[in-house]
Amino acid sequence: MSNLVKEKAPVFPISKVKKIAKCDPEYVITSNVAISATAFAAELFVQNLVEESLVLAQLNSKGKTSLRLSLNSIEECVEKRDNFRFLEDAIKQLKKNSALDKKRELNMQPGRSDQEVVIEEPELHEDDGVEEEEEEDEVSEEEEPVHNEELLDDSKDQQNDKSTRSVASLLSRFQYKSALDVGEHSDSSDIEVDHTKSTDP
């Protein structure tokens, strides 16, 4: 029984046909029998398209025995047969997608070759690079003590500057406070003098 069902069932899975049908904005609730009939119709349509494309490919093959169905042969069939003319937009979209895939493949290949070139170039001049590194090391060893001494001198100068700045700021604050204190004392002495004057008479 199961073998009979498999033989009578469509090649396209009914669940996938149902999913594709639900993508249509004008989809209406459809029975399983109608969906299986649609699957059979799609199977017959694809079979007819492939047969027509193969016939045109054989006519253009110029005596080749082995044929391969390509997108170009399907495109030719769509252009020459009126009953497949509605597929022109789909064929254009397929061609765009295949062109993008080819560009991606081409972009991937030059990147690999460029990386290999970058790796190979330093290997050609290994001796020159070693000599240059040795010269740079000698020069840097001679210059390092000078830089260290300069850094030490700079750090000492900065510490001296900081200490003089801090002392100067403390003194200025102290002088400012002392000036305020002097002003307060002078006011208080005036008051005391006034008190003595008031007590004398």
From Swiss-Prot:
GO molecular function, one term: protein heterodimerization activity
Keywords from the UniProt entry: DNA replication, Nucleus, Phosphoprotein
Main location per the UniProt record: nucleus
GO cellular component, as recorded: CHRAC; epsilon DNA polymerase complex; nuclear replication fork; nucleus
Sequence segments annotated as region (Disordered): 102-165, 178-201
Amino acid composition bias (Basic and acidic residues), ranges on this chain: 145-164, 182-201
Domain of life from the UniProt record: Eukaryota
InterPro entries to which the protein is assigned, alphabetical: Histone-fold (IPR009072), Transcr_DNA_Rep_Reg (IPR050568)
Subcellular location: Nucleus
Acidic residues bias: start-end ranges: 117-144
Subunit architecture: DNA polymerase epsilon is a heterotetramer consisting of POL2, DPB2, DPB3 and DPB4.
Additional remarks: In eukaryotes there are five DNA polymerases: alpha, beta, gamma, delta, and epsilon which are responsible for different reactions of DNA synthesis.
Functional description taken from the UniProt entry: As accessory component of the DNA polymerase epsilon (DNA polymerase II) participates in chromosomal DNA replication. It is required during synthesis of the leading and lagging DNA strands at the replication fork and binds at/or near replication origins and moves along DNA with the replication fork. It has 3'-5' proofreading exonuclease activity that correct errors arising during DNA replication. It is also involved in DNA synthesis during DNA repair.
Listed name of the protein: DNA polymerase epsilon subunit C
Organism the protein comes from: Saccharomyces cerevisiae (strain ATCC 204508 / S288c) (Baker's yeast)
